[in-house]
Amino acid sequence: EFLAREKVVLFEPAIRIGDFFIRIDVLVKDGNSFELIEVKAKSYNSVKPELFGARGGIRSDMLPYFQDAAFQSWVLRQAFPGSVIKTFLMMPDKAQVAPIAGINQMFRILPDRQVETTIPPGVDGKALAEHLLAKVDVTPSVNDILASPIEFPGGPLPFADAARLWAKHYANDEPV
């Protein structure tokens, strides 16, 4: 198993523990430390970040992304107790200007909705991605979500209790 290695970078690793199953977009393991990176298509402005509303809470349009990352972080903690987990959202940075012309020509959407990527000779795809993508540390917000009760009909419940309740209902094909 790749996660038994001391250092590894995995793309879309599947992690299952009990009734919980997740696929993390990118997972970087270094000893007992993890970087959980969720890649989102929603754009982000690194010059004028707008993740939080006027009153300091996570904006409603961003909340599902944070909650998804929080759930994945929680499951990863269950699978690797005592580990250190930093959680990131990676999003296109609309404050950046592409350093080459015709970047849109590098991506083609196929009839089955898959995306085909063609990187021309001489173009460093990794450097291009690092320039155009923002890796935003959301660890403090994820920790706040995990420490706060989840409001739902029948709730509120602590995050872990709500997750276990929903997993039980899902496993038994019962409504929540």
What residue spans do the PLM features occupy?
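Cysteine-cluster motifs in flexible loop/terminal segments that predominantly coordinate metals
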Residues: 153, 157-176
